[in-house]
């Protein structure tokens, strides 16, 4: 590069302005228009497009009204905690808006009957069951670069087995192979995900670190790269069972927003996942309505606008199902009071410490 190009401009702000214009025009000639621009003039960066998670409470906890498009989202938790259910609800919500969705089933465990019950249009859902991790991530890269896919699910990171591991013997030690695969793939994917405005949801599993004396021994598979590249990380846990008489009909579930680059993190929300139904919308409307003071609770009785809804939670849920007009009014009032609810669902101090430990590893 010539000395003229390296010359530092000194003097008035007019000189600096001219120098900046010259530098910007040189960058645009070399790398194309739009390589550098003022942030305020970039409309795409100002408004974050979102897709509902399928849970009203989680949409409020995320701070932007849903899961962000053009970003990487990680959903992790123990077995049978609702990770795939949450991802499929996001697919169903995207399809309702006319979006195209794809599901890379590395675990080879997707149940189309269950997906249909959650509201997923399985006839339009693209599915791939790859043979190894490299193939799965190449398929993901091609789909993202096409710009035609709105939501892409990868289930799961733990099942992305590197080709070398498949071709080797059962007892071969291959340390860090999957972590290197994920790191390389995310370096390639992250820019095209943003340009194509595709939301990529990685479902991940939990492992235990050996010899941890203080803090949480839990960690996620696939190394640390995904923790850094993800804009949103959701920790989903089953905290109890929902019973009808002696039969278990669902799970009480808690989701913590462990990382959020778009709004304040560390919020948590609880909802019911009913077997064969997914996230219970009526149960959530009832619980959030009580938190916001829209639904009154007196003992075991629930009431709205001086009208009794029923004794006990299940009876009140049945009332909401039978009265869609009242349900719509309560939901509208909850959305209008979302700021108040968001303050109330901020994680409390006993569990805040574990969240801080987890995010410190990011």
Swiss-Prot record:
SUPFAM superfamilies: P-loop containing nucleoside triphosphate hydrolases, RecA protein, C-terminal domain. Keywords: ATP-binding, Cytoplasm, DNA damage, DNA recombination, DNA repair, DNA-binding, Nucleotide-binding, SOS response. The lineage of its organism: Bacteria, Pseudomonadati, Pseudomonadota, Alphaproteobacteria, Hyphomicrobiales. One of its GO terms (biological process) is DNA repair. GO terms for molecular function: ATP binding; ATP hydrolysis activity; ATP-dependent DNA damage sensor activity; damaged DNA binding; single-stranded DNA binding. It comes from the Bacteria. It is found in: Cytoplasm. ATP binds at residues 77-84. Its main location: cytoplasm. This is Protein RecA. It holds the Pfam family RecA. The keyword RNA-binding does not apply. Belongs to the RecA family. Can catalyze the hydrolysis of ATP in the presence of single-stranded DNA, the ATP-dependent uptake of single-stranded DNA by duplex DNA, and the ATP-dependent hybridization of homologous single-stranded DNAs. It interacts with LexA causing its activation and leading to its autocatalytic cleavage. It comes from Nitrobacter winogradskyi (strain ATCC 25391 / DSM 10237 / CIP 104748 / NCIMB 11846 / Nb-255). One of its GO terms (cellular component) is cytosol. HAMAP family: RecA.
